[in-house]
Amino acid sequence: MENKTKLSDLRPGQQAIIMQFNNNEIFLKLMEMGCLPGEKIVIEQVAPLGDPISVNVLGYSLSLRLNEAEQIIVEIIH
C-alpha cells in the first residue's frame, strides 16, 4: 500500500522517497540541486512557525519554503 503525502506534512526525522512535483518551477529548482523523483529525502528541522523546513537529499542540507514543500509529493518510508 502506498503512503503518499505532501513533503510539508512530514515531521523531523521522517524519511520519504520523492514521487513527483506539482509545480514545474519547483521541479526545475530542485532538479538543479539533484532532487529527482526516486531520491530519498529526510526532514531535518522545521522552523518554529513551520517555515522554512530543512531537508537532506543526497547528503546535502537544503532549506525549502513551506509553499515549495507543499508541491512535492513523497512516499513515506517506514
What are these regions (language model features)?
Residues 2-3, 25-29, 40:
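Short alpha-helix capping/helix-loop boundary micro-motifs
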Residues 35-43:
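Conserved beta-strand/loop element in small beta-rich adapter and peptidoglycan-binding domains
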Residues 13, 50-78:
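C-terminal structural segments of small proteins and small subunits
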Residues 1-10, 78:
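C-terminal regulatory/oligomerization modules of transcriptional regulators
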Residues 13-26, 37:
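Short, structured beta-strand/loop micro-motifs enriched in basic residues and often containing a Trp
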